[in-house]
Swiss-Prot record:
UniProt KW Nucleotide-binding keyword: yes
Protein name, per record: Argininosuccinate synthase
Subcellular location: Cytoplasm
A GO biological-process term: L-arginine biosynthetic process
Residues reported to bind ATP: A16, Y17, S18, G19, G20, L21, D22, T23, S24, A44, G126
Length: 407
């Protein structure tokens, strides 16, 4: 089918809508470009905050949408996407806790569900042609709804700047509160907020204080440390400071506590899926505490080979999530294979929060393999130190044979 015939066949589109400048311009552009098709706006509430959602329905209708669905995904995001991912030990390139990446599959899934509900024949996103998100969304669409047409305006239209978008809306008498002077590109959800653009595009520039919005600057954090207790069952946080929470509630509580101490800031230059490098500043206060607590319990309960395997799975899982491959057999397999070890992650960790750091200082687990009796340097009745001699001879046998062959 030709591009023009394909455009003529699109009658109803579900747009991933944020209310920002880009998606506000996309609504009239779709109607003009796709033969006055019907536009249904869809917004995923993934914990980006009430300010981002306020007036969204009215704004979408004013821009030309026939309907606007705001779907609450907060609990599902944390319970079904974030917890399973971090329980594998996934962390991208050693530092990034995958905040944006983990939210994309659930948003795409919900968008497809709305499309099915309203009988749409196309879905649309506002991702740029240079970023990772276009691949993530469209990879999910391909896995969940290959029959739907996917529209990516940034790969079609001629507009290249915020000024172009503002002029486009002004010509059509569509009001917007956006300005041409927006400095940073931000993306927020319950797990984190990302910051890109502005002075951050030069890696020689230190991020200004205006970049950070979710955490206190470590140097301005309290001069006294705060201790926070985290309890978990099967790798899922169930209590914070002795109080029971839902998965989302626990994350919100830790975000507030850790953010006040400047915990969870990173400034990285990462390898994008599309081939280029990009610099991003990320704030993940509660997630940083959760990840540290999980690692602390892992140290107690997992034997050496289990931890080695877990590190390999975590590295692969991080790339799958980052690359938008959530709805794939391999991702499903890794999540399933990781669960038996995750089931062992029960216990309590006390973390010391101070000036940007979250340090596990106490930990205990009913599944702990650590024994003070075995580990002590004093005498015990279980471990005979003389037994180590035979073990060492066998362990080093290959090295011994190699050395003898050289002679």
């Amino acid at each position: 089918m030709s591009i023009e015939n394909n455009k003529a066949s699109v009658k109803k589109v579900v747009l991933a809508y944020s209310g920002g400048l880009d998606t506000s311009a996309i609504i009239p552009w779709l109607k003009e470009t796709y033969d006055n098709c019907e536009i249904v706006a869809f917004c995923a509430d993934v914990g980006q905050g009430e300010a981002e959602l306020e007036g969204l329905h009215e704004k979408a209708i004013a821009s030309g949408a026939s309907e606007c669905y705001i779907v609450d995904l907060k609990e599902e995001l944390v319970a079904d996407y974030i917890y399973p991912t971090i329980a594998t030990g996934a962390i991208y390139e050693g530092t990034y806790l995958l905040g944006t990446s983990m939210a994309r599959p659930i948003i795409a899934k919900a968008q497809v569900e709305v499309a099915r509900k309203v009988g749409a024949d196309a879905v649309c996103h506002g991702c740029t042609g240079k970023g990772n998100d276009q691949v993530r969304f469209e990879g999910c669409f391909a896995a969940l709804a290959p029959d739907l047409t996917v529209i990516a305006p940034w790969r079609e239209w001629s507009m290249v700047s915020r000024e172009d978008l503002l002029d486009y809306l002004a010509e059509r008498n569509i009001k917007t509160t956006a300005s041409a002077t927006k400095i940073y590109s931000r993306d927020a959800n319950a797990w984190h907020i990302s910051h890109e653009g502005g002075e951050l595009e030069d890696p020689w520039n230190e991020p200004s204080k205006e970049v950070w919005t979710m955490t206190v600057a470590p140097e301005d954090a309290p001069d006294e440390p705060e201790y926070v207790s985290v309890e978990m069952e099967a790798g899922r946080i169930t209590k914070v400071n002795g109080q029971s929470y839902t998965p989302y509630g626990a994350l919100m509580a830790l975000n507030e506590i850790a953010g006040a101490h400047g915990v969870g800031r990173i400034d990285i230059t990462e390898n994008r899926l599309v081939g280029m490098k990009s610099r991003g500043c990320y704030e993940t206060p509660g997630g940083t505490v959760m990840f540290a607590a999980l690692r602390a319990i892992e140290e107690l309960v997992l034997d050496k080979t289990s931890r080695e395997w877990r590190e390999q799975v975590g590295a692969k899982m991080a790339h799958l999530v980052y690359d938008g491959r959530w709805f794939t057999p391999l991702c499903e397999s890794l999540l399933g294979a990781s669960q038996p070890l995750a089931n062992l992650l029960n216990g309590e960790v006390v973390l010391k929060l101070y000036k940007g750091q979250a340090q596990a200082v106490k930990k205990r687990s009913p599944n702990s393999l650590y024994s003070e009796e075995f580990a002590t340097f004093g005498e015990d009745e279980v471990y005979n130190q003389k037994d180590a001699e035979g073990f060492i001879r066998l362990y080093s046998l290959a090295s011994r044979i190699r050395a003898l062959n050289v002679k």
